[in-house]
Amino acid sequence: MAIPKLQAYALPESHDIPQNKVDWAFEPQRAALLIHDMQDYFVSFWGENCPMMEQVIANIAALRDYCKQHNIPVYYTAQPKEQSDEDRALLNDMWGPGLTRSPEQQKVVDRLTPDADDTVLVKWRYSAFHRSPLEQMLKESGRNQLIITGVYAHIGCMTTATDAFMRDIKPFMVADALADFSRDEHLMSLKYVAGRSGRVVMTEELLPAPIPASKAALREVILPLLDESDEPFDDDNLIDYGLDSVRMMALAARWRKVHGDIDFVMLAKNPTIDAWWKLLSREVK
């Protein structure tokens, strides 16, 4: 009845993306980001320090950072810690008391904590649209594309994508920014959405050109990722200015598309703008 303990698996890669029936172009000025149910409770079923979930969180963080930089609204769904039997209704039959048994795990995972200008929607059923103002908020802001990330791919994420489609909102399911009970169920959800209700993409498809054109451009990429109000010098340690490991992993994933040897360890070894520009400005081989 309850969610079982979950095992990590290989996240989908570009060659795993099913044939999309639609070829919708991603339009940032028409899009919104949904971070679906990334609460401690739902993520905890993979255990602590799960590399797969670290990558999923890093990919979501990269998308969120991009959205913040481009004035794309960010929405979260989160189940409440208190849910009456009337509110849960048939969910009790299918999943038992769920999160209500572990109210201390209700918050969104630390590395994706919502900002004050984000919208957190109370989640009551599989679809993020059920008993929520999401459709109205999207349409009032002129948004008709929804980037879907989070857990679980074949339950709430797939249902939300299909519900969005039926409301004339174009869903973009981000294959490597989702997680599921198993790889088979993850891939099933992608196949369904690609063929029935949306477009399936990889994180990298929604992000801009991966390599900054200059050291100044690199600085513009880095500054929004820092917690400190003071700007670092080019040789300052960026970790001292609040750059965390999740954002560093996301940067490594983006830059590795051009320089295949770049990884988290390489960036963390010398986390300065000078050192990173030296890595990025190398001739591509």
Curated annotation (Swiss-Prot):
One of its GO terms (molecular function) is magnesium ion binding. Keywords: Cytoplasm, Enterobactin biosynthesis, Hydrolase, Ligase, Magnesium, Metal-binding, Multifunctional enzyme, Phosphopantetheine, Phosphoprotein. Residues 209-284 form the Carrier domain. Pathway: Siderophore biosynthesis; enterobactin biosynthesis. The modification O-(pantetheine 4'-phosphoryl)serine is found at residue 245. Mg(2+) binds at residues 227, 242, 244. Its EC number is 6.3.2.14, 3.3.2.1. It is found in: Cytoplasm. Residues 2-213 are annotated as: Isochorismatase. Pfam families: Isochorismatase (PF00857), PP-binding (PF00550). SUPFAM superfamilies: ACP-like (SSF47336), Isochorismatase-like hydrolases (SSF52499). Disruption phenotype: Cells lacking this gene are hypersensitive to the antimicrobial peptide wrwycr. Changing residue 269 to A: Behaves similarly to the wild-type. It catalyses: 3 2,3-dihydroxybenzoate + 3 L-serine + 6 ATP = enterobactin + 6 AMP + 6 diphosphate + 4 H(+); isochorismate + H2O = (2S,3S)-2,3-dihydroxy-2,3-dihydrobenzoate + pyruvate. InterPro entries: ACP-like_sf, Isochorismatase, Isochorismatase-like_dom, Isochorismatase-like_hydrls, Isochorismatase-like_sf, PP-bd_ACP. Inhibited by 3-[(carboxyethenyl)oxy]-6-hydroxy-1-benzoic acid and 3-[(carboxyethenyl)oxy]benzoic acid. It comes from the Bacteria. Its cofactor is Mg(2+). Changing residue 263 to R: The catalytic efficiency is the same as the wild-type, but a 3-fold decrease of the affinity for the S-dihydroxybenzoyltransferase EntE is observed. Proteins EntB, EntD, EntE, and EntF form a multienzyme complex called enterobactin synthase. Homodimer. Also forms a specific pairwise interaction with EntC; this interaction likely facilitates substrate channeling to connect the EntB and EntC active sites. Involved in the biosynthesis of the siderophore enterobactin (enterochelin), which is a macrocyclic trimeric lactone of N-(2,3-dihydroxybenzoyl)-serine. The serine trilactone serves as a scaffolding for the three catechol functionalities that provide hexadentate coordination for the tightly ligated iron(3+) atoms. EntB is a bifunctional protein that serves as an isochorismate lyase and an aryl carrier protein (ArCP). Catalyzes the conversion of isochorismate to 2,3-dihydro-2,3-dihydroxybenzoate (2,3-diDHB), the precursor of 2,3-dihydroxybenzoate (DHB). In the N-terminal section; belongs to the isochorismatase family. This is Enterobactin synthase component B.
